[in-house]
Design a protein with these regions (language model features):
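Membrane-embedded, hydrophobic transmembrane alpha-helices
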Residues: 1-97, 336-338, 347-357
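Specific aromatic-rich, kink-prone transmembrane helix
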Residues: 19, 250-279
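Active-site lumenal/periplasmic loops and adjacent helix-entry segments of GT-C-fold
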Residues: 114-233, 240-250, 259
Length: 358
């Protein structure tokens, strides 16, 4: 299926522009500065989180895919309208950069574009776990969500095998949604059109992480360049994160490695920076609006990565446990540790659903 000019316009609108406005509105609610890179990242994290919250119950109820499309689209329209009414887009800015740092930023952007071009060429070279593509294509074709046996093509009444994992992490259904609203076939969406967007999100997250580590933009750009070079030349094994990112980013577990884990790391780093260092154990922990927003971002990110792969339930839980323990001691606040650990409730709930289905 060849994408028409209209399909490309919808692709740019829904996958490149709309997430920025959605993310900017979310940044406003979480007391975050809504720069374009941060808005782009927060847009996708919030879109994934809400899709996870909406879609899993609808899959369990065996509702048609069209209902999911309508309900989720209403959310997107609602959050964009909220941003327009509240005029949150006025806070959308490009980060101010020192003149001396522009050379590094230009090199960083050139490296990122080169990586996207190379990945664009390589995403069709690997067919492992193509059942994700089959699930997405079948969802669009039959209007059923994960109710087709990928081996036989026949409709099933209950889930079996790998579908147990997909029910609580319906990444293929999200790809099907993108296919539905843009008119681009699900296979083309996953292999060709979605990877460049995900790589752009990954690079923006790297930039945000660099912002938590370095004050000067030249150091931030060098940090991102180093990471991108490691990814570009890291294709020395079929099992490492670099390979999954370059040639298999259409898989949910690859997106978890490239986007999900860095997003969690950024959420934790930002929370750590915002929490005070000079408090005593006996002092009552009180959070301001920005700190509450940072805690909400941790929860939001945990919901978001839950959509990508069932592996996220283990990976994010380990990260939550470790960071919560460190924060509780370093910040001398048991409440902070509990607030971080409580994000595990998301994973416990979805794993409980999967267990009951078995």
């Amino acid at each position: 299926m060849t994408a028409s000019v209209g399909n490309i316009v919808l692709y740019i609108l829904f996958l490149w522009i709309a997430p920025v406005f959605v993310g900017n509105a979310i940044c406003n609610r979480l007391s975050m500065r809504g720069t374009i890179p941060r808005s782009f990242v927060m847009g996708y994290l919030s879109m994934w989180a809400v899709f996870q919250i909406i879609t899993v119950p609808l899959i369990l109820l065996k509702v048609s895919f069209l209902v999911d499309v309508v309900v989720y689209s209403m959310f997107l329209i609602g959050i964009i309208v909220y941003g327009i009414v509240k005029k949150t887009y006025r806070s959308m800015t490009i980060p101010k950069v020192e003149p001396s740092a522009w050379v590094g930023i230009i090199v960083m952007l050139a490296t990122g574009i080169y990586m996207i071009v190379q990945s664009f060429r390589l995403q069709l070279t690997n067919a492992d776990d193509t059942r994700f593509v089959v699930n997405a294509v079948d969802t669009v074709r039959t209007n059923r969500m994960l109710l087709t046996d990928v081996n036989t093509g026949k409709e099933i009444l209950s889930w079996t095998g790998d579908l147990f994992k997909d029910v609580i992490s319906p990444w293929a259904v999200f790809a099907a949604y993108l296919s539905k609203i843009t008119g681009i076939s699900a296979a083309s969406m996953m292999h060709t059109f979605l990877p460049p967007v995900l790589l752009a999100v990954m690079m923006c997250i790297f930039w945000l992480i660099a912002g938590e580590l370095f004050d000067k933009h030249i150091y931030r750009s060098l940090f991102v360049i180093l990471l991108l070079v490691m990814y570009i030349y890291g294709y020395f094994s079929i099992y490492n994160a670099e390979t999954f990112t370059i040639i298999r980013l259409w898989q949910g577990k690859a997106t978890m490695a490239a986007v999900g884990i860095p997003a969690l790391l950024y959420a934790f780093l930002r929370l750590y920076r915002l929490l005070p260092d000079d408090r005593r154990w006996k002092e009552k922990t009180v959070y301001n609006a920005e700190q509450k927003g940072a805690i909400c971002m941790v929860w939001l990110t945990v919901f978001a990565v839950a959509l990508l792969t069932s592996m996220s339930y283990i990976l994010s839980t380990v990260m939550i446990g470790c960071f919560g323990f460190v924060y509780g001691i370093a910040k001398k606040s048991l409440r902070t540790a509990v607030m971080v650990w409580s994000a595990c409730l998301v994973n416990i709930a979805y794993l409980g659903i999967s267990t009951l289905l078995h």
